[in-house]
């Protein structure tokens, strides 16, 4: 039962501030569905907003994040519920620079997972975590003055990136500012 639909409509136009975070350095954000937290991170600290308790806190890392969050890209892995930060493009192609690291909030520590690289930086790409196949998939984005139309995936067992080959069918054109959605009944991404 909706008692006052006019009030609900007007309330939906405004946002109520519940927390505020800022960083002097590059940062990223993600939702941790396992802990019901919003995490906002940079290289030296993580800011956490808990949706259950409605409290926020800042935690300085024991040692700085080994990955430079240039694009601020991350995901929370359901296999271990850790926050993974990834930046697989390295300006000079050096493969000894960490490009993926996992943060464990229980002991406030980082673990380097990969130094694997991709050929270009993918600004505004979309991503999907394939729990069944244990792969993190990215698509689209742009970098080096070109749009990306390829799928790349990272195997979450050995943390190696690879370019994926797609089955024949409709051509997928390069794009950015995209989103991906998974259909479990069809085992397909849209």
What are these regions (language model features)?
Residues 2-190:
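Kelch-like beta-propeller repeat domains
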